[in-house]
């Protein structure tokens, strides 16, 4: 898939995953997740849109941090929730 230039990439920072063991909210709630996404602005680890609670998308909206990277082993892609596109 092609990537697009995205002005939100200016928000990307060097981050350390806050909860490398899983979705921050799901761990607290003891909820299941499917895949994980890493916020590239603050290091929040949230669950994907295929997960029941979609915490990565919720974080992007509430914190205003739209750029995430897959936090799955072997995957190397980034997504912008504002533009709904790979970046």
Predicted regions and their residues:
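A detector for small-residue-rich transmembrane helices and their helix-helix packing motifs
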Residues: 2-3, 37
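Cys/His-rich, Zn2+-coordinating zinc-finger modules
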Residues: 3-22, 29, 46-87
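Canonical RING-type zinc finger of E3 ubiquitin-protein ligases
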Residues: 31-40
